[in-house]
């Protein structure tokens, strides 16, 4: 498992995801252009700090793209509320340990927290608003990896 797998599982387990996700599948690095599809894109990983024992604290950046119905204000408000509530839920995730494969070794990893920013509409998916709107939310996952040694 990687931090990408971990966050995909967390987002899929969001209690209200079934209201907006047709087949409970979040694509990786792309999304279908039809409403209600989601894609989780990994935008980089960086080292925040490393202690003397080799324990690394890292930050992984994601963008969740969501294609939502947009026929009327009710749909657009539901989409915006979904992103708002998802952001709040993600920011309240508890620390959790999991095993991550690092260079062929199983390494103890601890998810620390998720933060979110910039939940917004990105534009039309077709020529009219009836074709759906793409929304995005940026997600940052902070996690620790124990030393590989």
What are these language model-derived features?
Residues 1-23, 28, 45-149:
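Charged, amphipathic alpha-helical segments and their flanking helix caps
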Residues 35-37:
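Extended compositionally biased segments used for macromolecular assembly or nucleic-acid engagement
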Residues 41-43:
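Short, low-order "capping/linker" segments at domain edges
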């Amino acid at each position: 498992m990687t931090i990408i797998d971990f966050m995909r599982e967390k987002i899929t387990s969001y209690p209200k995801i079934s209201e907006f996700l047709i087949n409970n599948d979040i694509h990786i690095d792309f999304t279908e252009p039809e409403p209600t599809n989601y894609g989780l894109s990994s935008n980089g990983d960086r080292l925040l700090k490393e202690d003397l024992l080799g324990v690394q604290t890292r930050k992984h950046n994601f963008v969740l793209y969501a294609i939502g119905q947009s026929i009327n204000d009710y749909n657009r408000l539901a989409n915006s509320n979904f992103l708002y509530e998802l952001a709040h839920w993600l920011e309240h995730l508890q620390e959790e340990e999991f095993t991550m494969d690092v260079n062929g070794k199983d390494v103890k990893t601890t998810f620390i927290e998720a933060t979110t920013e910039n939940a917004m509409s990105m534009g039309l998916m077709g020529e009219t608003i009836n074709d759906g709107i793409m929304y995005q939310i940026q997600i940052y996952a902070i996690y620790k990896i124990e030393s590989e040694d």
